[in-house]
Amino acid sequence: MTHSPDLKGSSFTLSVLHLSDNEIANTVEFLQEKVSQAPSFFASAPLVINIAKVQGDIDFPALKQGIADAGFIPVGITGSKDKRVQNLASEAGFAIMSASKSPSQAPAKMAPTKVVRTPVRSGQQIYAKDGDLVVLAHVSAGAEVIADGSIHIHGTLRGRAIAGASGQQEARIICHDLQAELVSIAGDYWLSDQIESEYWQKKVMISKAEESLHLEVLAI
């Protein structure tokens, strides 16, 4: 029996780079710095470019090459309804994308919570598909914990925590001691140098609202 290809719709969480100007060199330098800070997270990651705030023309071929040279995979642009701009981007090999009008929701049927009782060592990756993740120990630097739902860490988070991996905007990250290399919820992320000192080494809850991460120190 011959099986033919099947084309179906789906959704993915992609990193979005919001440009404020058309200075390609500055953009490439910024991306290179991000890759050097968290290479296992950013290297060969697909990237969408939001150009809504850019005034003036963009050298799209140079932008695409710069993104690739920095270690990302340029996917498409969003944020412009100007047909001339869209045509220039398309000619350079960018897809023309539009943001979804409704946020991704949790799966209709969540999987049971995945519980990890041992420390997550450097180089390990734990993934809770379609559900929440609970780690009853520490997450070491160089380790990665991922969940389509929320993540609870009953120890120190020194590695990377990625919640809402399938786009769930309501996901949370809760940890007893925040020293993370990276935290991410539904595609929005902060690196360690973006986390303010008032939250460092504290018990915190991280949530997402209005396309930005929010941190709250927990008293309990």
From Swiss-Prot:
Query: InterPro entries from the entry?
Result: CAP/MinC_C, MinC, MinC_C_sf, MinC_N, Septum_form_inhib_MinC_C
Looking up SUPFAM superfamilies in the UniProt record yields:
Cell-division inhibitor MinC, C-terminal domain (SSF63848)
Q: Which Pfam families match?
A: MinC_C, MinC_N
Q: Which GO terms describe its biological process?
A: cell morphogenesis; division septum assembly; regulation of cell division; regulation of cell septum assembly
Say yes or no: keyword Cell division present: yes
List UniProt keywords, sorted A-Z. Cell cycle, Cell division, Septation
Looking at the keywords, is Cell division present? Answer: yes
Coiled-coil segments on the chain, per record: none
Summary of subunit composition and partner proteins: Interacts with MinD and FtsZ.
The free-text function statement in the UniProt record for this protein reads:
Cell division inhibitor that blocks the formation of polar Z ring septums. Rapidly oscillates between the poles of the cell to destabilize FtsZ filaments that have formed before they mature into polar Z rings. Prevents FtsZ polymerization.
Similarity comment text for this entry: Belongs to the MinC family.
- Spell out the HAMAP family in the cross-references: MinC (MF_00267)
Q: What is this protein called?
A: Probable septum site-determining protein MinC
- Record organism: Vibrio parahaemolyticus serotype O3:K6 (strain RIMD 2210633)
